[in-house]
UniProtKB/Swiss-Prot annotation:
Keywords: DNA damage, DNA repair, DNA replication, Ligase, Magnesium, Manganese, Metal-binding, NAD, Zinc. The active site is at residue 119. It is an enzyme of class 6 (ligase). The keyword Metal-binding applies. This is DNA ligase. GO terms for cellular component: cytosol. DNA ligase that catalyzes the formation of phosphodiester linkages between 5'-phosphoryl and 3'-hydroxyl groups in double-stranded DNA using NAD as a coenzyme and as the energy source for the reaction. It is essential for DNA replication and repair of damaged DNA. Transmembrane segments: none annotated. NAD(+) binds at residues 34-38, 83-84, 117, 140, 182, 298, 322. Coiled coil: none annotated. The keyword Translocase does not apply.
Length: 687
């Protein structure tokens, strides 16, 4: 692959992986199957291995996924909470073992001692104990910074699940110890909670992982307290050095202090015993009381671990082996088209319910017509289905040998199934679109986009409420949200919907309506970049919205900018400029913006402090930063009146060099440009 093509493909892969990371870790709503995610990650790793000069410090291959939510205080981990590299074959496990032996310089024939354990599917957290007392806890977040969920962790296990977070440790623990483990829902507790939801007429959770993650990240700890979360410990860290020789001794200490550890943990001598353990657990995986999609293999000797160290994202002394997804045969009942906020029709497959990875599944989506044709899927087919990554239902392939001749290919409708408008597939596009400007399904999708956390952040306004508003004719565009009568909100909240708490009395409709009105009032005060993103302008994502806001600084200037002015904005190409211009010149769109402003929505530009050491300076960031992401560092510089450039030249005023800084650092030194490390950079930000 040519370098230019490789660079473009790498950029595309990074964006797709970051979007999937955000959906999985921050929104708790996976959008990619694990196999597809792993395929994208492996492709990006291969490109970066072939072209090392294309590696960026903020590449997903260099960092742990999962940025902290803005709803919680940020906590800096004393030692990074790294994620694990994963393998899926015996060959890859052999490569891992060979690499460990090579790095340790072990003689031929000397076996490595490992600890193996089931890979738990929950939310990784860290607990801090001082003098035996629990003093704080956080999620993993991006590995460097997590979310402070102390209040919620205090009540994990409060329902007598016998797998909770101890408030005080037993025995004689060190003066300070950091305990890491997984918060999860055991199958029996998950099923009981879903039964309560169904009895109440509400929507059950899709899987235990989503339920556990959503419960732990509740703003109200009382919601967490009424749900049967459990905690299983698998790591302990002591400042100044661990007092143990092996990981197994750590696990024994954790159990002695009162923590639940996994009874399936085993010590293995050499890779042969690891493979035997893997095979036994694969046979028993669905009999276990919790969801698991693989095993974790860790070097047992702690001195060897220190010698092996870690790469930027993964420890070299551990790896996760992931099982292939469970597959079941079922018969397709029907294929139909759903309509999204941009008018795209997505084929949806309904099939006879089957149990997969502990959950009943009856529906999956196909991306587009091309995928359906490629897989040769017909209405009435028997098909193999799976929950890819144990989460997302997926149709794997048809079983043509079971066809009777009655199966029929699915044809996309000529008219929108929701509004009746014409459906088209433009030349060069893979999707069919509804052309109806007033399509209710599109409107529901646009409202959800407008209200999401990264846009105007209207807390509590999701798809069900949006659909209810559209059904009642209360909302024709975003501005109508601010004119919905209080009584209508009460009526909507009186209908069955997923409660904040499955075990408690339903919140009164009046209180819920008051909360919604308050959320709408808060959303009136927003930033220009959030407002632009919320409008759903084609090709204007978060990054482009932020760039436009910084460049123009004023909504009116953006609305009046012609294509030439828009093409002058960094990272805005001709196609994007054309899309923005077309949107801003559409009279209906202008009316919506005017009505939003009349409703009191005030999109303010972020204040740029044109003073201090960065004011008017050109700054280049190179290498990895531990205190913040590359995007955060860039935003901090720009907020202080500086400009961040991607290359070093004689016009560069300052280079910030993080870990593993490369050619940019060398060029800066050759040109005599001032270079500072991360510590000095953080100090300058505080000036």
């Amino acid at each position: 692959m040519k370098k230019a093509d490789a660079a473009a493909r790498a950029r595309d892969l990074r964006e797709r992986i970051r979007a999937a990371d955000h959906a999985y870790y921050v929104l708790d709503q996976p959008v990619l199957a694990d196999a597809e995610y792993d395929r994208l990650m492996h492709e990006l790793q291969a490109i970066e291995a072939e072209h090392p000069e294309l590696v960026t410090a903020d590449s997903p291959t260099q960092r742990v996924s999962g940025a902290p939510s803005e709803r919680f205080e940020r906590v800096v981990h004393r030692e990074p909470m790294l994620s694990l590299g994963n393998v899926q074959s015996d060959d890859e496990l052999h490569e891992f073992d060979a690499r460990v032996r090579r790095l340790l310089g072990l003689p031929e024939g000397e076996a490595v001692g490992y600890v193996v354990e089931p890979k738990l599917d929950g939310l990784a957290v860290e607990l801090v104990y001082r003098d035996g007392a629990f003093t704080g806890g956080s999620t993993r977040g991006d590995g460097v910074n997590g979310e402070d969920v102390t209040a919620n962790l205090r009540v994990v296990g409060g329902l007598g699940a016998n797998r909770g977070v101890p408030h005080a440790l037993e025995g004689t623990p060190p003066p300070r110890v950091e305990v890491r483990g997984e918060v999860l829902l055991f199958k029996e507790h998950f099923e009981a909670m879903n039964r309560q939801l169904v009895r109440a007429g509400d929507e059950p959770f899709a899987n235990p992982r989503n339920a556990a993650a959503g419960t732990l990240r509740q703003l109200d700890w009382r919601v967490t307290a009424r749900r049967p979360l459990s905690f299983v410990a698998y790591e302990a860290l002591v400042p100044g050095g661990d007092p143990w020789r092996t990981h197994w001794e750590k696990l024994e200490a954790l159990a002695a202090w009162g923590f639940e550890t996994n009874p399936e943990n085993r010590r293995c001598r050499g890779l042969g015993e690891v493979l035997a353990y893997r095979d036994r657990m694969a046979e028993r995986r669905f009999e276990l009381p919790y969801d698991t999609d693989g095993i974790v293999v860790k070097v047992d000797d702690l001195d060897w671990r220190r010698r092996l160290g870690a790469a930027s994202k993964f420890p070299r002394w551990a790896v996760a082996f992931k099982y292939p997804p469970q597959e079941e045969a079922t018969r397709i009942r029907r294929i139909w088209a759903s309509v999204g906020r941009t008018g795209v029709l997505t084929p949806v497959v309904d099939f006879d319910p089957v149990r997969l990875s502990g959950a009943m599944v009856a529906r999956a989506t196909l991306h587009n017509e091309d995928e359906m044709r490629r897989k040769d899927i017909l209405e009435g087919d028997w098909v193999l289905v799976r929950r890819a990554g144990e989460v997302i239902p997926e149709v794997v392939k048809p079983l043509p040998e079971r066809r009777t001749g009655e199966e029929r290919p699915f044809r996309f409708p000529a008219e929108c199934p929701v509004c009746g408008a014409r459906v088209v597939r433009e030349e060069g596009e893979k999707v069919y679109r509804c052309t109806g400007a007033a399509c209710p399904a599109q409107l529901v999708g646009r409202i959800c986009h407008f209200a999401q956390r990264r846009a105007l952040d209207i807390e509590g306004l999701g798809e069900k409420l949006a659909a209810g508003l559209v059904e009642r004719g209360q909302v024709k565009d975003f501005a109508d949200l601010y004119a919905v009568p209080f009584e209508v909100w009460q009526q909507l909240f009186s209908r069955p919907r997923k409660e904040q708490d499955a075990g408690a009395a339903r919140e009164l409709p009046e209180k819920s309506a008051q909360n919604m009105v308050a959320a709408l009032e808060r959303s009136r005060s927003t930033t220009l970049r959030r407002f632009l993103f919320a409008l759903g302008i084609p090709q204007v994502g978060e990054a482009t919205a932020a760039t436009l806001a910084r460049h123009f600084g004023d909504l009116a200037r953006i609305l009046d900018a012609d294509e030439e002015a828009l093409k002058g904005v960094r990272d805005v190409g001709p196609e994007t400029a054309s899309e923005i211009r077309a949107w801003t010149q559409e009279p209906q769109n202008r009316r919506v913006v005017e009505r939003l402003l009349a409703a009191g929505v005030r999109p303010e530009p972020e204040v740029v402090e044109a003073r201090g050491p960065f004011a008017g300076k050109t700054v280049v960031l190179t290498g990895g930063l531990s205190a913040m992401s590359r995007d955060d560092a860039k935003a901090e510089v720009e907020r202080r009146g500086g400009k961040v450039s991607g290359s070093v030249s004689r016009k560069t005023d300052l280079v910030v060099a993080g870990e593993e800084a490369g050619s940019k650092l060398e060029k800066a030194r050759s040109l005599g440009v001032r270079v500072v490390g991360e510590e000095e950079f953080v100090r300058l930000l505080k000036e």
